[in-house]
């Protein structure tokens, strides 16, 4: 199982907590997913109202690790401040760092992301950066102290799957010892299987489950898909070929 900043997690599936039809459905989806980590919006908890307290109680009862995020932050200052709030609220140094650069695509701001990651790492945070598959950006993030990388598969909430297989495969080859998590854009269990087959350590998703007609069933489907992909990656899959190759022996074939 993946090891993030010295902590071994119980599952390769990480699940977000937003946009579920009800708290009961959220809890059921988590149970069916066997997810080991729940991502939680800091802004949702910062208000301190009863609904927020009830939600936090629900997450605690699930018995999963909590990864707070800085979703919705568009500047370094905003992201760093939100991360500091998260450490106070959740008593953890883990932070999923998001610094958004474009409103339409929700694409990460690479410059702000590196700057914020450097500040947070220096302050003792264990940063999980939401990034693209850009190799140079990921090198900079590792240089400033990130020991996990979370490249997107596609823009948040699109469900398009893995838009750049080449880039994701290259990233895996370049960082063989760094935990890599495909974050964002997954819509189907087959997308998660594909990420695992590329050798990624985990996947993080939210909308694909929360917006499904049956979130609990979809969560279970993703759990099975992640398991299948990880098993396949560890089984040394055959190499793809451009030309056909017979699978049955020709020795002893009758000569007509």
From Swiss-Prot:
- Subcellular location per the Swiss-Prot or TrEMBL entry: Cytoplasm
Keyword field? Cytoplasm, Schiff base, Thiamine biosynthesis, Transferase
Q: In which pathway does it act?
A: Cofactor biosynthesis; thiamine diphosphate biosynthesis
Q: Which domain of life is it from?
A: Bacteria
Stated EC number for the protein is 2.8.1.10
This enzyme catalyses: [ThiS sulfur-carrier protein]-C-terminal-Gly-aminoethanethioate + 2-iminoacetate + 1-deoxy-D-xylulose 5-phosphate = [ThiS sulfur-carrier protein]-C-terminal Gly-Gly + 2-[(2R,5Z)-2-carboxy-4-methylthiazol-5(2H)-ylidene]ethyl phosphate + 2 H2O + H(+)
Q: Name one GO biological process term.
A: thiamine diphosphate biosynthetic process
Binding residues for 1-deoxy-D-xylulose 5-phosphate, per the UniProt record? 157, 184-185, 206-207
Q: Pull one GO CC term from this UniProt entry.
A: cytoplasm
Coiled coil ranges (UniProt) are: none
Which enzyme class? transferase
Cysteines engaged in disulfide bonds, as pairs: none
Per UniProt, what is one GO molecular function of this protein? thiazole synthase activity
Where in the sequence is the active site? 96
Known InterPro entries for this protein?
A: Aldolase_TIM (IPR013785), Thiazole_synthase_ThiG (IPR033983), ThiG (IPR008867)
- Matching CDD domains: ThiG (cd04728)
The record describes the protein's role as:
Catalyzes the rearrangement of 1-deoxy-D-xylulose 5-phosphate (DXP) to produce the thiazole phosphate moiety of thiamine. Sulfur is provided by the thiocarboxylate moiety of the carrier protein ThiS. In vitro, sulfur can be provided by H(2)S.
The family classification in the record reads: Belongs to the ThiG family.
Q: How does it assemble?
A: Homotetramer. Forms heterodimers with either ThiH or ThiS.
What's the protein here called?
Thiazole synthase
- Species of provenance: Roseobacter denitrificans (strain ATCC 33942 / OCh 114)
- The gene it comes from is thiG
């Amino acid at each position: 199982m993946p090891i993030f900043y010295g902590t071994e997690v119980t599952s390769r599936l990480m699940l977000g907590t937003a946009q579920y039809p009800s708290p009961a459905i959220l809890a059921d989806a988590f149970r069916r997913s066997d997810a080991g980590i729940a991502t939680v919006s800091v802004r949702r908890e910062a208000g301190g109202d009863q609904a927020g307290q009830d939600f936090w109680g629900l997450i605690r009862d699930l018995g999963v690790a909590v990864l707070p995020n800085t979703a919705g932050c568009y500047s370094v200052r905003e992201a760093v401040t939100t991360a500091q709030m998260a450490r106070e609220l959740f008593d953890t140094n883990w932070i999923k760092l998001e610094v958004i650069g474009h409103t339409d695509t929700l694409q990460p701001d690479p410059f702000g992301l590196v700057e914020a990651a450097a500040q947070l790492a220096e302050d003792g945070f264990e940063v999980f950066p939401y990034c693209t598959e850009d190799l140079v950006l990921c090198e900079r993030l590792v240089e400033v102290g990130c020991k996990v990388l979370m490249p997107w598969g596609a823009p948040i909430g699109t469900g398009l799957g893995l838009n750049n297989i080449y880039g994701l495969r290259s990233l895996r080859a370049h960082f063989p010892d760094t935990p890599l998590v495909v974050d964002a854009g997954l819509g189907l269990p087959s997308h998660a299987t594909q990420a695992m087959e590329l050798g990624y350590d985990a996947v993080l998703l939210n909308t694909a489950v929360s917006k499904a007609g049956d979130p609990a069933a979809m969560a279970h489907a993703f759990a099975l898909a992640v398991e299948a992909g990880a098993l396949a990656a560890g089984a040394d899959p055959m190499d793809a070929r451009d030309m056909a190759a017979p699978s049955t022996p020709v020795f002893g074939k009758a000569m007509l």
